[in-house]
């Protein structure tokens, strides 16, 4: 019988990148997990924005989402750094602060809900690394991510901020200054993870920067793309739809703000999409054609187009 997890979709994935959702569902089914929909779930809400304006409102909304998973009786899986950061930190605060928990439950009682602190929030990166394991992922690979010349696909991984820090809350396995989990997960698919300058730098999108100061946010993105290409990457992969949007849409937006641009576009994949390809799934199943940056160059290198 498949193990069950509550699947927290967030906002960006279902609205902008449904292929990430499809890939995640397919990959987890292949790994022996059933992802259960959280009917009625709202925005996480975004920690850097909502939390900075009104901590109690932010944590109350997050607690409502947590209570939906508690009602179903399964831990939560997120595929977005922001959603993970919000739900996981709210869970931590409510378990550590009785006064805050009492306040939140008074509010939730008005809609016949209660936060009980009985579920754990997992990020897809950490769940795959610790709960599933690199060994099992390797065993599921039917089509290693190798180019037609026999060389492994070169992938530049992007971790993102809320996955790593604050480390005392995220529970990230290993060093947050020199993380390796996503690198190992990528290499389990038969690809090569390439090191590059400023690897753990922000993509530029978070904290409201993208919506408020787009050019500032794109400075980060442009620098990261330059660094990834310099390292010889064929593509970049991430574990967050917001980071994904910043790299995917951001490469299109750069031309409106900068004269000096990266020498070429770098295709962008969520990790579950790369895993789907390695597990033998068709590119069409993973909705790669919905990305802003054409993924065809990578598919051609893999002999899939």
From Swiss-Prot:
Superkingdom per UniProt: Archaea
Stored Pfam families: CCG
Enzyme Commission number(s) of this protein: 1.8.98.-
Gene Ontology biological process: methanogenesis
GO molecular function, one term: CoB--CoM heterodisulfide reductase activity
Broad enzyme group: oxidoreductase
Keywords: Methanogenesis, Oxidoreductase
Disulfide bond sites: none
Assembly and binders: The heterodisulfide reductase is composed of three subunits; HdrA, HdrB and HdrC.
Family: Belongs to the HdrB family.
Chain's role: Part of a complex that catalyzes the reversible reduction of CoM-S-S-CoB to the thiol-coenzymes H-S-CoM (coenzyme M) and H-S-CoB (coenzyme B).
Protein name (Swiss-Prot/TrEMBL): CoB--CoM heterodisulfide reductase subunit B
Species this protein is from: Methanopyrus kandleri (strain AV19 / DSM 6324 / JCM 9639 / NBRC 100938)
């Amino acid at each position: 019988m498949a193990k069950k997890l509550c699947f927290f979709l967030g906002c960006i994935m279902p609205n902008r990148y449904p292929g990430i959702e499809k890939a995640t569902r397919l990959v987890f089914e292949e790994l022996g997990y059933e992802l259960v929909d959280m009917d009625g779930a709202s925005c996480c809400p975004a920690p850097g924005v909502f939390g900075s304006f009104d901590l109690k409102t932010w944590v109350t909304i997050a607690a409502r989402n947590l209570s939906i998973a508690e009602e179903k009786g399964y831990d939560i899986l997120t595929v977005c750094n922001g959603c993970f950061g919000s739900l996981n930190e709210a869970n931590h605060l409510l378990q550590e602060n009785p006064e805050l928990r009492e306040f939140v439950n008074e509010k939730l009682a008005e809609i016949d809900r209660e936060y009980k602190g009985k579920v754990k929030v997992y990020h897809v990166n950490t769940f795959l690394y610790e709960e599933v394991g690199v060994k099992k992922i390797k065993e599921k690979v039917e089509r290693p991510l190798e180019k037609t010349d026999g060389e492994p696909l070169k992938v530049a991984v992007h971790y993102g901020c809320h996955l790593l820090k604050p480390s005392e809350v995220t529970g990230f396995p290993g060093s947050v200054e020199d993380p390796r989990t996503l690198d190992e997960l990528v290499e389990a698919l038969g690809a090569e993870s390439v090191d590059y300058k400023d690897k753990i730098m922000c993509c530029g999108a978070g904290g409201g920067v993208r919506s408020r100061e787009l050019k500032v946010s794109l400075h980060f993105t442009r620098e990261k793309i330059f660094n990834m290409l310099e390292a010889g990457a064929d593509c970049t992969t991430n574990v967050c739809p917001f980071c994904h949007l910043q790299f995917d849409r951001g490469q299109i937006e750069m031309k409106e703000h900068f004269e000096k641009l990266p020498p070429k576009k770098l295709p962008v994949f969520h990790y579950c999409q790369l895993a789907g390809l390695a597990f033998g799934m068709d590119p069409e199943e993973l909705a790669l054609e919905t990305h802003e940056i054409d993924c065809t160059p990578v598919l051609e290198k893999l002999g899939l187009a």
